[in-house]
Amino acid sequence: MARLIDQFERLPGIGPRTAQRLALHLLNQPEEQIRQFADALLAARTQVGQCQTCFHLSADPECEICRNPERRNGLICVVADSRDLLALERTREFQGRYHVLGGLISPMDGIGPELLHVTPLVARINQEDITEVILALTPSVEGDTTSLYLARLLKPFCPVSRIAYGLPMGSELEYADEVTLSRALEGRRPLD
Protein backbone atom coordinates (compact mmCIF):
# COMPACT_ATOMS: atom_id res chain seq x y z
CA MET A 1 0.00 0.00 0.00
CA ALA A 2 2.89 2.38 0.75
CA ARG A 3 4.14 1.99 -2.85
CA LEU A 4 0.69 2.86 -4.21
CA ILE A 5 0.41 5.94 -1.98
CA ASP A 6 3.90 7.01 -3.02
CA GLN A 7 2.95 6.74 -6.70
CA PHE A 8 -0.16 8.88 -6.20
CA GLU A 9 1.88 11.50 -4.30
CA ARG A 10 4.07 11.93 -7.37
CA LEU A 11 1.10 13.33 -9.28
CA PRO A 12 0.81 17.14 -9.37
CA GLY A 13 -1.52 18.57 -6.74
CA ILE A 14 -1.77 15.30 -4.79
CA GLY A 15 -0.60 15.45 -1.20
CA PRO A 16 -0.17 12.60 1.29
CA ARG A 17 -3.77 12.61 2.54
CA THR A 18 -5.31 12.66 -0.93
CA ALA A 19 -2.88 9.96 -2.07
CA GLN A 20 -3.95 7.79 0.85
CA ARG A 21 -7.66 8.36 0.08
CA LEU A 22 -7.12 7.43 -3.58
CA ALA A 23 -5.18 4.29 -2.65
CA LEU A 24 -7.85 3.19 -0.18
CA HIS A 25 -10.58 3.86 -2.72
CA LEU A 26 -8.83 1.77 -5.38
CA LEU A 27 -8.21 -1.09 -2.98
CA ASN A 28 -11.94 -1.24 -2.24
CA GLN A 29 -12.84 -1.56 -5.94
CA PRO A 30 -13.47 -4.86 -7.73
CA GLU A 31 -10.39 -6.30 -9.41
CA GLU A 32 -11.93 -5.86 -12.87
CA GLN A 33 -12.42 -2.13 -12.28
CA ILE A 34 -8.80 -1.77 -11.16
CA ARG A 35 -7.68 -3.66 -14.26
CA GLN A 36 -9.74 -1.30 -16.47
CA PHE A 37 -8.16 1.69 -14.71
CA ALA A 38 -4.65 0.31 -15.28
CA ASP A 39 -5.46 -0.50 -18.93
CA ALA A 40 -6.78 3.03 -19.48
CA LEU A 41 -3.56 4.50 -18.05
CA LEU A 42 -1.36 2.32 -20.26
CA ALA A 43 -3.49 2.99 -23.35
CA ALA A 44 -3.32 6.74 -22.79
CA ARG A 45 0.45 6.57 -22.39
CA THR A 46 0.97 4.55 -25.58
CA GLN A 47 -1.73 6.08 -27.81
CA VAL A 48 -1.62 9.78 -26.95
CA GLY A 49 1.16 11.82 -28.50
CA GLN A 50 1.51 15.40 -29.70
CA CYS A 51 -0.21 17.21 -32.54
CA GLN A 52 2.37 17.80 -35.27
CA THR A 53 1.10 21.36 -35.76
CA CYS A 54 0.51 22.82 -32.28
CA PHE A 55 2.03 20.19 -29.92
CA HIS A 56 -1.21 19.72 -27.95
CA LEU A 57 -1.98 16.19 -26.77
CA SER A 58 -3.55 14.12 -29.52
CA ALA A 59 -4.10 10.50 -30.50
CA ASP A 60 -3.97 11.60 -34.15
CA PRO A 61 -1.24 13.39 -36.13
CA GLU A 62 -3.33 16.58 -35.85
CA CYS A 63 -5.48 17.48 -32.83
CA GLU A 64 -9.20 18.28 -33.00
CA ILE A 65 -8.56 22.01 -32.65
CA CYS A 66 -6.12 22.15 -35.57
CA ARG A 67 -8.51 20.06 -37.71
CA ASN A 68 -11.54 22.22 -36.88
CA PRO A 69 -12.41 24.44 -39.89
CA GLU A 70 -14.53 26.69 -37.64
CA ARG A 71 -11.46 27.99 -35.76
CA ARG A 72 -9.86 31.32 -36.75
CA ASN A 73 -6.69 30.54 -38.67
CA GLY A 74 -4.95 33.91 -38.29
CA LEU A 75 -4.94 33.93 -34.49
CA ILE A 76 -2.51 31.84 -32.42
CA CYS A 77 -2.59 31.65 -28.63
CA VAL A 78 0.74 30.48 -27.17
CA VAL A 79 0.54 28.46 -23.95
CA ALA A 80 3.15 26.66 -21.85
CA ASP A 81 1.41 23.28 -21.78
CA SER A 82 -1.80 21.43 -22.59
CA ARG A 83 -3.25 22.14 -19.13
CA ASP A 84 -3.25 25.85 -19.96
CA LEU A 85 -4.83 25.16 -23.36
CA LEU A 86 -7.61 23.13 -21.74
CA ALA A 87 -8.22 25.90 -19.17
CA LEU A 88 -8.64 28.44 -21.98
CA GLU A 89 -10.91 26.08 -23.91
CA ARG A 90 -13.20 25.79 -20.87
CA THR A 91 -13.95 29.52 -21.19
CA ARG A 92 -15.28 29.00 -24.75
CA GLU A 93 -14.05 32.53 -25.52
CA PHE A 94 -11.02 31.86 -27.71
CA GLN A 95 -11.82 30.65 -31.22
CA GLY A 96 -8.35 30.74 -32.76
CA ARG A 97 -5.61 28.15 -32.81
CA TYR A 98 -2.99 27.27 -30.20
CA HIS A 99 0.70 26.59 -29.93
CA VAL A 100 2.00 24.62 -26.93
CA LEU A 101 5.58 25.53 -26.01
CA GLY A 102 6.19 22.52 -23.80
CA GLY A 103 7.33 24.64 -20.85
CA LEU A 104 8.77 28.04 -20.00
CA ILE A 105 12.25 29.50 -20.26
CA SER A 106 13.97 28.89 -16.93
CA PRO A 107 17.75 29.43 -16.90
CA MET A 108 17.91 28.23 -13.27
CA ASP A 109 16.54 24.86 -14.41
CA GLY A 110 18.64 24.77 -17.57
CA ILE A 111 15.65 25.34 -19.86
CA GLY A 112 16.38 27.70 -22.72
CA PRO A 113 14.28 28.51 -25.79
CA GLU A 114 16.03 25.77 -27.76
CA LEU A 115 14.35 23.16 -25.52
CA LEU A 116 10.88 24.56 -26.23
CA HIS A 117 8.73 24.50 -29.38
CA VAL A 118 9.82 28.01 -30.39
CA THR A 119 11.30 27.19 -33.82
CA PRO A 120 8.07 25.49 -35.00
CA LEU A 121 6.13 28.55 -33.78
CA VAL A 122 8.24 30.89 -35.90
CA ALA A 123 7.82 28.51 -38.85
CA ARG A 124 4.01 28.55 -38.42
CA ILE A 125 3.98 32.33 -38.36
CA ASN A 126 6.06 32.44 -41.54
CA GLN A 127 4.00 29.78 -43.35
CA GLU A 128 0.48 30.66 -42.22
CA ASP A 129 -1.29 34.01 -42.55
CA ILE A 130 -1.05 34.94 -38.86
CA THR A 131 -2.55 38.30 -37.90
CA GLU A 132 -1.86 38.14 -34.14
CA VAL A 133 -0.10 36.03 -31.53
CA ILE A 134 -1.55 36.07 -28.02
CA LEU A 135 0.79 35.01 -25.23
CA ALA A 136 -1.13 33.24 -22.45
CA LEU A 137 1.74 32.39 -20.14
CA THR A 138 1.78 32.15 -16.36
CA PRO A 139 2.45 35.43 -14.52
CA SER A 140 5.75 34.32 -13.01
CA VAL A 141 9.43 35.10 -13.54
CA GLU A 142 9.62 32.25 -16.06
CA GLY A 143 6.39 33.29 -17.78
CA ASP A 144 7.53 36.91 -18.00
CA THR A 145 10.95 35.88 -19.32
CA THR A 146 9.37 33.66 -21.97
CA SER A 147 6.87 36.37 -22.93
CA LEU A 148 9.59 38.99 -23.35
CA TYR A 149 11.71 36.61 -25.41
CA LEU A 150 8.80 35.65 -27.68
CA ALA A 151 7.59 39.24 -28.06
CA ARG A 152 11.02 40.36 -29.28
CA LEU A 153 11.31 37.35 -31.57
CA LEU A 154 7.82 37.53 -33.09
CA LYS A 155 7.04 41.27 -33.35
CA PRO A 156 8.82 41.62 -36.72
CA PHE A 157 6.34 39.10 -38.17
CA CYS A 158 2.99 40.05 -36.60
CA PRO A 159 1.41 41.87 -33.65
CA VAL A 160 2.00 40.18 -30.28
CA SER A 161 -0.21 40.66 -27.22
CA ARG A 162 -0.39 39.13 -23.77
CA ILE A 163 -3.50 38.21 -21.83
CA ALA A 164 -4.37 40.58 -18.98
CA TYR A 165 -3.75 39.53 -15.40
CA GLY A 166 -5.54 40.78 -12.37
CA LEU A 167 -7.79 39.87 -9.53
CA PRO A 168 -9.86 36.68 -9.52
CA MET A 169 -13.64 37.09 -9.36
CA GLY A 170 -14.94 37.26 -5.81
CA SER A 171 -11.59 38.13 -4.25
CA GLU A 172 -10.99 40.96 -1.79
CA LEU A 173 -8.57 43.77 -2.69
CA GLU A 174 -7.02 43.78 0.76
CA TYR A 175 -5.79 40.19 0.31
CA ALA A 176 -4.19 40.72 -3.11
CA ASP A 177 -0.42 41.05 -3.33
CA GLU A 178 1.23 44.17 -4.76
CA VAL A 179 2.22 42.57 -8.08
CA THR A 180 -1.32 41.34 -8.72
CA LEU A 181 -2.78 44.75 -7.90
CA SER A 182 -0.22 46.49 -10.11
CA ARG A 183 -1.02 44.17 -13.01
CA ALA A 184 -4.74 44.68 -12.46
CA LEU A 185 -4.26 48.45 -12.66
CA GLU A 186 -2.07 48.17 -15.76
CA GLY A 187 -4.59 45.90 -17.49
CA ARG A 188 -7.59 48.11 -16.76
CA ARG A 189 -10.12 48.77 -19.54
CA PRO A 190 -12.67 51.53 -19.98
CA LEU A 191 -16.26 50.70 -19.10
CA ASP A 192 -18.67 50.70 -22.02
From Swiss-Prot:
A GO term for molecular function: DNA binding
Entry annotated with the keyword Lipid metabolism: no
Record key words, sorted: DNA damage, DNA recombination, DNA repair, Metal-binding, Zinc, Zinc-finger
InterPro entries: DNA_Rcmb_RecR, Rcmb_RecR, Rcmb_RecR_Znf, TOPRIM_dom, TOPRIM_RecR
Zinc finger residue ranges, C4-type: 51-66
The Toprim domain, residue ranges: 74-168
A single GO BP: DNA recombination
Pfam families membership: RecR_C, RecR_HhH, RecR_ZnF, Toprim_4
UniProt xrefs under NCBIfam families: recR
HAMAP family: RecR (MF_00017)
Protein's job: May play a role in DNA repair. It seems to be involved in an RecBC-independent recombinational process of DNA repair. It may act with RecF and RecO.
Family: Belongs to the RecR family.
Name of the protein described by the UniProt record: Recombination protein RecR
Highest classification ranks of the organism: Bacteria, Bacillati, Cyanobacteriota, Cyanophyceae, Synechococcales
